[in-house]
Swiss-Prot record:
Pfam families: Ribosomal_S14. One of its GO terms (molecular function) is rRNA binding. Coiled coil: none annotated. Binds 16S rRNA, required for the assembly of 30S particles and may also be responsible for determining the conformation of the 16S rRNA at the A site. Gene3D superfamilies: 30s Ribosomal Protein S14, Chain N (4.10.830.10). GO terms for cellular component: cytoplasm; small ribosomal subunit. Keywords: Ribonucleoprotein, Ribosomal protein, RNA-binding, rRNA-binding. It comes from the Bacteria. GO terms for biological process: translation. This is Small ribosomal subunit protein uS14A.
């Protein structure tokens, strides 16, 4: 489990990205890079890290399920993810 402070910080970043999305888009279209530079750093979408929705783990996250590989494996074995089953050949 990730630290709660890290998860909260990431959530705050997501809110900032959403808040400044339209303004950032307009400034990029105009080419006003000076105004872009004055926006908060955390409003840039490149600063976001994909995190597991279950554990908050930042690494090894499967995009489709928004879960870390470890949490995905546990939930899949329990049959809690619809349409996913262990394959064998």
């Amino acid at each position: 489990m990730a630290k709660k402070s890290k998860i909260a910080k990431e959530r705050k970043r997501e809110e900032l990205v959403n808040k400044y999305y339209e303004l950032r888009k307009e400034l990029k279209a105009k080419g006003d890079y000076e105004a872009l530079r004055k926006l908060p750093r955390d409003s840039s979408p490149t600063r976001l890290t994909r995190r597991c929705k279950v554990t908050g783990r930042p690494r090894g996250v499967l995009r489709k399920f928004e879960m870390s590989r470890i949490a995905f494996r546990e939930h899949a074995h329990k049959g809690q993810i619809p349409g996913v089953k262990k394959s064998s050949w």
